[in-house]
Regions:
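N-terminal nucleotide-binding beta1-loop-alpha1 segment
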Residues: 1-21
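A short, N-terminal amphipathic alpha-helix
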Residues: 32-49
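Acidic donor-binding segment of Leloir-type glycosyltransferases
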Residues: 49-70
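Short phosphate-binding loop-to-helix
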Residues: 64-98
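The conserved acidic donor/metal-binding loop of glycosyltransferases
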Residues: 102-106
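Conserved donor-nucleotide/metal-binding helix-loop-beta segment in metal-dependent transferases, i.e.
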Residues: 108-137
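Short, glycine-/small-residue-rich phosphate/pyrophosphate-handling segment
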Residues: 144-168
Length: 214
């Protein structure tokens, strides 16, 4: 029987997201863009439990409308939020694997499928953690941990998180396996990221005028 997966997506208020793009998008456009990306990741699914971690009631309401479970926390920031909500997440699912994914992955239409394939192909007899990094090989867009490892993991999101998570796995004696999947490598944080998926952005924001790339 395949291992059961729970997909955990921390989601911040759409109105407060993507501030690094403030010179290219209006606040309303940034909010709509953040929501559109989150709706790709937080999609109704039967192949995994979907759990949204948030500290905003409007996000909680939105997540429930997407058939997701909701874990609320008073913590702010990605690492504190995951740490504070860890026990609630574990109580809300009996999944064998907990997969933490960012909410700003516009191409990630099948995170669960990509992770499940990697888990199924893992070498026997090894304790493994699975990571999908960004195109700069700096961040951790997707992090898949066994239930036991999720319970003890020290989340290190932020600059150089891939290196930090890889180092932690080494200290714990866990083998790191990278999920090399193009759909998981694109997140939208910078103007270069926007240019990579400008057709997606233009479809979401018909009132947006792209800057001249030159």
């Amino acid at each position: 029987m395949p291992d059961r997966i729970a997909l955990v997506i921390p989601v911040r208020s759409f109105e407060h997201g993507k501030t690094r793009l403030a010179d290219a998008f209006t606040p309303d456009q940034r909010s709509r863009l953040a929501r559109a990306m989150a709706e790709i990741v937080v999609a109704p699914r039967v192949d995994a439990d979907t759990i949204v971690v948030c500290n905003d009631e409007s996000i909680a309401h939105w997540a429930r409308s997407r058939a997701a479970q909701v874990v609320t926390t008073d913590a702010t920031g990605l690492n504190p939020s995951l740490l504070a909500s860890r026990e609630s997440i574990l109580r809300s699912t009996d999944a064998d694997w907990i997969v933490v994914a960012h909410a700003d992955l516009p191409l990630a239409t099948d995170i669960v499928g990509a992770v499940a394939a990697a888990i199924a192909a893992r070498p026997s007899g090894h304790d493994c953690v699975f990571v999908a990094t960004d195109r700069r090989r700096d961040g951790t867009n997707v992090l898949a941990l066994s239930r036991a490892n999720f319970a003890r993991w020290e989340f290190a999101y932020g600059p150089n998180s891939l290196s930090a998570h890889t180092d932690q796995a080494g200290r714990l004696g866990i083998r790191v396996i990278e999920i090399d999947h193009a759909s998981l490598a694109v997140d939208i944080d910078t103007h270069d990221d926007v240019h990579l998926v400008r057709d997606f952005v233009a479809g979401v924001l018909p009132d947006w005028t792209p800057a001249d790339p030159t």
